[in-house]
């Protein structure tokens, strides 16, 4: 059995023991590191859930889009960063503009619009991933992603902080950081695993079904690729095939197959990110409809 399973079980058990001990401390009148009673606060748990969902989706997109730009299109790091600028600009505009222009906006509605914008942006990108796609296809999706992330950023911090008294703000800050870090870690791991699994399955299946690939190459590929296929650019793959003394015709077949498999893997991984964003919409019920008092400016 994979050691990952045992680590997950051990982590779950450790978390259970930790929470039981924190509950014991709270019930005995001592000060716990985290008061378990905080999780009975619907507004707080709603905000933390949205932070977790946001960073899960965000991390998955930030993992896959640079792969498309830097590996599939073989852009430099600088060129890749330039293509992501629309996201940064839109995020800044939305995060700063929404509280200023609509200080009494319904937080739940803003969060839902933010998640919807992120999801639509991802789906637009999925639809544009075809063999002839260029770097320009990421502009609109990144703009929509940025608007969505900015909308969430404009609301979630105030939602969580205003859910508890000032005396517990430090605990809430710790929980918020935990939710974001956990979401980012899980998003990268989940989306990355799905991407590599899809890439591996597609390439192996394509090699096995291709009559132009020699039987010896098929057998070697099945053995060597069983543990996963690296996400390689065309030039990287050609170098590896040349070093392996693969014939030019067979090498071209494999390069073409890898190109198709990369796009399929990216589409599946991004589709999963979109599904996670869509699912998060069903967990926004605990976000309040009224703006927290701290967000609403007092009348002069």
Give the positions of each predicted feature.
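Transmembrane core module of solute transporters
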Residues: 3-6, 27-171, 187
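Small-residue-rich alpha-helical segments with characteristic i,i+4
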Residues: 61, 67, 138-226, 285
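Transmembrane helix-loop junctions in multipass membrane proteins, especially transporters and channels
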Residues: 19, 23-28, 100-104, 130-134, ...
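Transmembrane-helix exit segments and adjacent C-terminal regions of multi-pass membrane proteins
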Residues: 1, 22-24, 38, 43, ...
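Hydrophobic core of alpha-helical transmembrane segments in multi-pass integral membrane proteins
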Residues: 8-20
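Small-residue-rich packing faces within the transmembrane alpha-helices of Major Facilitator Superfamily
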Residues: 12-15, 92, 119-120, 126, ...
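Membrane interfacial helix motifs at helix-loop boundaries and amphipathic/re-entrant anchors
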Residues: 1-4, 65-83, 124-138, 198-211, ...
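Membrane-embedded alpha-helical bundles that form the substrate/pore pathway
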Residues: 51-58, 177-184, 264
